[in-house]
Amino acid sequence: MSVLGLFRRKDKEDVNKLPSVHVTLDELRCAVLQFEREMDNGINRTVLMKEDGSLDLPRIARYLGGVSDQKFYLSRETFEIFAEEEQSIPYHLDRVQLAVDDYLNETGKLPIVEDSVYFEVDCRMLYQQHYLHEIPEFKLYVTDQEMMVTHRQPVALPDVKAQEDHSYVLL
């Protein structure tokens, strides 16, 4: 057995000694932020990501007070964290974000559904033009923050026509 193997085994034994904890999504987000603050510049939460997209929770156990008994997933492109029951969201966010970026780079336009007040991504068009291999089962939107894709419907901007002043002044 190598010296490196001894260290790895010890790390696994230490993790097994930690209690199992049930954490909220907000508690996990705070733990991930603490982890990022303590890392060197240029290192972000994606280093916690396993191949299946889930977070390597034993690596942040010290911030949680134990090893979480749940599974959480991370979007590599948007850095958002999701509970296990929402694991399809980060999968689609990542693929659609890359497709939107590619489409924007090639055409100079955003792939938005025509007349969409919410900047809904036109996933059908991205699929038809081979930017996507599948269409998500839910709507996605482009935010005004660095053209990031989100699954949350933004608040609609007020309709300018509806706000026209139709009052009269009597003299």
Which ranges hold each PLM region?
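Short acidic linear motifs
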Residues: 1-171
